[in-house]
């Protein structure tokens, strides 16, 4: 039960942080905010300060930032619709920025006590590895990229190598500050027990002592890795390598957090379980940031796309696109988004049965 509550709290905090981003940006840009609410449902507490009503509501599952002129036309000069394009842009992307920043801060806190980090240094080559030496690989080379994907962390190597593994990879390594391109092919090797196995023939993963600077560096790498995971997941979805049934909604994510928490607690205690959940929370925060910036109606990225289209219309025809069309498009997009959410939630529940 405790992990379910933690999962719900994580969702609530991340959504509230997202709305806080919109709120702070709106205030900074001079846009009137009619209500800023933490939580949903019946009001537990509210206070009006200036033009804004601040609310605390019963259900800890998010919040909202209701701006003047957000969903309707308004004659108020402080209405969202009457602002210049760059102010709208800042307001629209501020929520995603706050989610990304939250994910980064969580990772920074988790890495604050790190004593060392694994690197992508090649530490050993199989004696039968066919490409040793100046024209191939050498111990001490640092893996920089695989198949065009930048490698930041040790965990990136198996992730990227496992994507559409054909038995051949294009690898870029750093040696004495220079980038060297190599093409590697899996070979058949024999282990100490005489068993044959197929591998690329190199071992990687040096160790570097943690410092205040590289703690920040590796925190950034880890956060950008979460961005890449979202991108790769979307690519797999669009290419057909993954289906809609592979998606997880809030129910599935709560189930995953609960499972991770219980398994880790059984193996290493509650502290380790909480640490694992916080890593997961950081990934969810970054996921929310990226997904909200997709150029789809009803999402922040959709609003940014409309800004671009509207700017083109003004440049070409000297006339803005009426906001009523935006409202219709957003309404349709929201309905489709809710339909997808219901579908994913249904499948999450079926998986639990």
Question: What are the roles of these predicted feature ranges?
Answer:
Residues 133-155:
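Conserved PDZ fold ligand-binding element
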Residues 144-145, 159-199, 203:
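PDZ-domain C-terminal substructure recognizer with occasional recognition of PDZ-binding tails
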Residues 106, 110, 338-351:
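Membrane-helix cytosolic exit motif
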Residues 3-7, 83-92, 276-280:
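Residue-level signature of transmembrane alpha-helical entry/exit and packing/kink sites
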Residues 11-15, 66, 99, 283-293, ...:
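Alpha-helical transmembrane segments of multi-pass membrane proteins
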Residues 79, 83, 189-288, 308-332, ...:
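Functional transmembrane alpha-helices
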Residues 2-75, 291-312:
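Small-residue-rich helix-interface/hinge motifs
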């Amino acid at each position: 039960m405790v992990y379910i509550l933690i999962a719900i709290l994580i969702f609530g905090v991340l959504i509230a942080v997202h709305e806080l981003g919109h709120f702070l940006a709106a205030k900074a840009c001079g846009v009137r905010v009619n209500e800023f609410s933490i939580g949903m449902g019946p009001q537990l507490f509210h206070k009006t300060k200036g033009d804004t009503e601040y609310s605390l509501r019963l259900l800890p599952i998010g919040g909202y930032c209701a701006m003047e002129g957000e969903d309707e036309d308004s004659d108020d000069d402080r209405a969202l619709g009457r602002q210049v394009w760059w102010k709208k842009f800042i307001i629209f992307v501020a929520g995603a920025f706050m989610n990304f920043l939250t994910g980064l801060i969580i990772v920074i806190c988790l890495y604050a006590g790190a004593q060392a980090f694994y690197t992508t240094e090649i530490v050993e080559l199989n004696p039968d590895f066919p490409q040793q030496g100046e024209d191939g690989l050498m111990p001490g080379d640092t893996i920089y990229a695989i198949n065009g994907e930048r490698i930041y962390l040790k965990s990136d190597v198996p992730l990227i190598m496992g994507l559409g593994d054909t038995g051949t990879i294009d690898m870029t390594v750093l040696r004495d500050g220079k980038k060297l391109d190599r093409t590697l092919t899996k070979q058949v090797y024999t282990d100490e027990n005489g068993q044959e196995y197929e591998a690329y023939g190199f071992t990687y993963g040096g160790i570097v002592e943690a410092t205040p600077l590289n703690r920040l560096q590796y925190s950034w790498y880890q956060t950008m890795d979460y961005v890449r995971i979202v991108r790769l997941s979307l690519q797999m979805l669009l290419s057909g390598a993954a289906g809609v049934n592979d998606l997880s909604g809030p129910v599935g994510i709560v189930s995953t957090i609960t499972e991770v928490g219980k398994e880790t607690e059984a193996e290493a205690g509650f502290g380790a379980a909480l640490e694992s959940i916080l890593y997961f929370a950081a990934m969810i925060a970054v996921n929310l940031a990226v997904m909200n910036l997709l150029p789809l109606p009803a999402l922040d990225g959709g609003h940014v796309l409309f800004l671009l289209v509207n700017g083109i219309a003004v440049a070409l025809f000297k006339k803005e696109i009426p906001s009523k069309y935006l409202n219709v498009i957003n309404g349709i997009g929201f309905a489709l988004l809710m339909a997808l959410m219901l579908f994913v939630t249904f499948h999450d529940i079926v998986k639990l049965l």
